[in-house]
């Protein structure tokens, strides 16, 4: 029978619940178990696809085209599994499905209520995560903190799961804060005690406490927490601030968290072989070289807006034993007068995805600087579209080349809306989303980056595409279309062969990068800076 691990948080947000869930998933996977992870987000939006990056951070896209929370990126990078639509569920999605069923008459005239209809739908999503992946263990993280009004239906559903599947088949892990007060020179357990009290008031007794802390928790304090929170002392696990997020699996393993979970489930599994992970960490902590990358984007004020791009750049650096230092640069601030001064000294330039008209001219100036000065350049999604426009304006002589996203009535729209996107009423969930094949042109830098495969699979999130009316003209001027859809209708990758590295992709390669398996384009990009 499938086992269920529920991860909740208390005291404050951003304690690292997602990293704890992902780290435990990695430990259990390395013990030979099939693991999947999901997150429940208590906001009313159906998904984060229409939310501002300043509000939510990056929108992570899964193979099946689901727009999800950025924590799913952590999950995939840690457990190296591709997740699906059941791995991210919001309050909006739950209520939408319940209301759809009610409209179809599937509740047979019953009064639709939070209990049982909403909680049953939540439990159904937990079960579907198990059945669609045939997993031995499902790890479910609940967003927010205990005490939030929005989280109550999810916590009630978790409480009911104990009766539905049996106490021996589910375990509750609660992450809390054990703050260190410098003025007093001591750590405080009261926030943890009150958080557990709140959780128990809802009907959930945690089995494990993961305590976020700056310093090691002394044994006497560990015993105190165990006594007041009614857990075993070995179930009080500290999660200290670490040099790298990839330290956390080993920190948790050294405290026996995976053993405790399996013992609770009465499961036996081989000891986790963490050799590859340990070797990777050794590389991360002993990087010798340094490369400086300029990330020219629109949402740089929030680091989480480009978290997968930043991680993918670091992953690529590990291959070359190099610490990749990423400097975010606001594209709005770049002008003709300051572009050279702003970008001088960088080993590479990357322009990631985005939407809208703000900052586009600064991106185009940055791309022009990279092309003319032979600075390695990688464009992603919007970065590919702006690279096409820059080439058209400054090489092909189409000085008014633009994008239909900003100027829908312009004469020379190098980038235009996809034909199947023109008459859509809804914005949410209607873009070209998910995994699609890309046919590579032999002999290109792009094909070389992917070990000369003829076709690759990549994740997408876009509504606009390269306008094929200009393909022949730009080809004549030296632009190479290195990747297309298999039917040759959609341009996926462009490159300039004369440059050391000038490649731009419509897809999002960052979503498939792993710390121990860097994505091909990122690896080639960093390689070109060596």
Swiss-Prot record:
Cellular component aspect of the GO annotation: cytosol
Positions with a binding annotation for Mg(2+): 71, 141
Region entry Amidoligase domain, spans: 1-267
EC number of the protein: 6.3.4.2
Binding site for ATP: 14-19, 71, 240-242
Pathway: Pyrimidine metabolism; CTP biosynthesis via de novo pathway; CTP from UDP: step 2/2
Family listed: Belongs to the CTP synthase family.
Protein name (Swiss-Prot/TrEMBL): CTP synthase
